[in-house]
């Protein structure tokens, strides 16, 4: 344990001191705007409160000006004791949102500077940082077919917010920062309920404080993986062959290869929605996305059990809470399917007989080949559609009443876009039949929504306008695939359903996929 403590303290030698006077400068709004204000900061809140995204810049300036006046800040703090700062009025709620976002932006500055300096130091070209989310699957196809065991890991979640504050306290010596952070967390007394639930394995961030909670959660996950790197270094005398980080930003993925371990703090940047991290050596491979990770090895079950033991004990020692050993499941790859990144993945074993002729003797050799297979988890997708009110839990399509007040073209466009995005993301599935069931649900849900709007039945509505109206909006993805794979090839979209396609433009996971 002393060795671990020294390992951690060595990396934390560069603790951060934040310049809080920046928070109270009148023109900090310009910095906030350059940091991606038009991207994701106020995307949800602007919809909730009816503000136009174009006016966010003026709102930030107005708020910072009010913060600059200490009376307004004192009023907000005092008023929060009565209204819980969650906002019984739209104004208080929106002001608290703005303060939280500005606070998060300031906190991100030191870590973004470290990332930029590292890229310049290593002279990493920008075009090398672009990488699709689908690029992880060829890596799994290439590596997992040679391995024996896989551990499905759910990153344990902290049971108390003070644990998160203590984690940050190890890195940050700025007392005002910690006090302000505690203030935000205590005011959101029910933050645990919307940050994570017992039934989900990933953190579900609050729409109101998404940026702030992403920052805190990324810090926490970094600490979990920091222990993992320490254990890995202690258990092997060989250096890692290669390792890297996939950082999903607002608009693209960045891949940083040959990243020094002490530089992995860059994953704590708040505007990274989700983070991949993996390393590979001849015998072990690790991949994580959000709060779910897989650890695959060519070793024995005993070796994987030792890894599980180390994980549980180090997490309990470091985070001071029960880390729930059942969150690490060890299974043999040959007879196990695991859900990862919206796909149900497994290792298929195919047997083929080869006749070998040697002089006058002939014999048959049975050859076993392993293949990494990915399919669409139809039941989980139907569950996601059910939560989004497109169908019942059994998959029966229903109307979407909340969209009934939109124009016909907007309704068709929304349903068509969801369907095309799902087809696009699950193009790597070896079995496409499940996708056509999802398409049927969305098409009929669209028809029911239009019929509800026009106060008619689905049959009457389709008879009047024709079923081709819906077909036009749901076939774009299939037309693209037809252009990519001409009829002269063996690929047919409605034929074998076995071809897998990994696209290089998948920059984020679909929300419906993420729910499942």
Swiss-Prot record:
Keyword annotations for this protein, in alphabetical order, are: Chloroplast, mRNA processing, Plastid, RNA-binding, tRNA processing
Location within or outside the cell? Plastid, Chloroplast
Pfam families in UniProt:
Intron_maturas2 (PF01348), MatK_N (PF01824)
Q: Which GO terms describe its molecular function?
A: RNA binding
Top-level taxon in the UniProt lineage: Eukaryota
Gene Ontology biological process terms, A to Z: mRNA processing; RNA splicing; tRNA processing
Output a single Gene Ontology CC term carried by this record. Answer: chloroplast
- Record's InterPro entries? Domain_X, Maturase_MatK, Maturase_MatK_N
Primary location: plastid
Entry function: Usually encoded in the trnK tRNA gene intron. Probably assists in splicing its own and other chloroplast group II introns.
Q: Which family does it belong to?
A: Belongs to the intron maturase 2 family. MatK subfamily.
Q: Which PANTHER family match?
A: MATURASE K
Protein name, UniProt field: Maturase K
- According to its UniProt entry, this protein's organism is Galanthus nivalis (Common snowdrop)
Lineage runs: Eukaryota, Viridiplantae, Streptophyta, Embryophyta, Tracheophyta
